[in-house]
Amino acid sequence: MDGGNEIWDGPKLVTDGEWAGWRTWAGMDAFEDQTGPFYFREENGVIRSAFRAEPRHMNGGGFMHGGCMMTFADYSLFSISWAHLKDVRAVTVSLNGEFLGPAKAGDLVESTGEVTKAGGSLLFVRGLVSTGGAPMLNFSGVIKKIRPR
């Protein structure tokens, strides 16, 4: 998901544990692997991304670090856009967010959203990160498809 040239065969389906039935891009983005793991699945035509907050995701005040929230929002741009990104590479060219509320260790953190416009090379996406139904982060971003040269 970084625009690199590595061979990619899509997200992997998780078959056991808490995340059985979800998909992950584990191994595709080293930074997300360090921060996550993050997961996504389709529910009634809506892409939902999620992860379980851990102590390592918290700031000094005991709440989820804003950088972790933004990393998850960036991941969510790609999961929300998954149907538009099959067989192409892409990079984030813009990501904006407004912090709305906290999460604590142990919380299930989720996101949903939509592609608001899909052009030839650009995808415009918006979404909401929440926990327990309470909003945490409103985000929007732009993804650029990278075509092989």
Give the location of each predicted region.
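Terminal targeting signals and extreme-terminal segments of soluble enzymes
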Residues: 1-149
